[in-house]
Amino acid sequence: GISEAKIINATKIIVENWVNWKCRFGCPEYGKWLNCPPYTPTPEETKALLKEYKIALIFRVEDDKVKLYNILNKLEREFFLQGYYKALGFGGGHCPYCEKCIVDFKACKNPLFVRPSMESCGINVFETAKNAGFPIKILKDKNQKVYRFGLILIK
């Protein structure tokens, strides 16, 4: 399950243009997944979207992308069923459900589960996690414990 989760004010979610650029210039997965650039909302669109929300949930799981996206989708649905009809989730990293993405929403095998990655939309995961009180740092060794973050805009 979830290692830790926190409710935060949506103003604590940091969106910056450079984040999306790190996807474009430096990520070998760029353009290969529907939940990554160039198929995802721009930082400007994300900033506009965040103005429509006041509360969000940020959570982390130990390094398991499938678990992250499964929890993300389950929580988003649960918030929706509880009356939070604007609930909208963001994952971390590319979609884990297919070995290779078709990169076509009409042909997607998991269209109900695809959610944009925070990074692809310009969300600075490091600063947002720090704002929520999570300890987060750059990992310098592959043996260090990895946490993946998910975010749900609630209302």
Regions inferred by a protein language model and the residue ranges of each:
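Catalytic cores of enzyme domains
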Residues: 3-33, 37-155
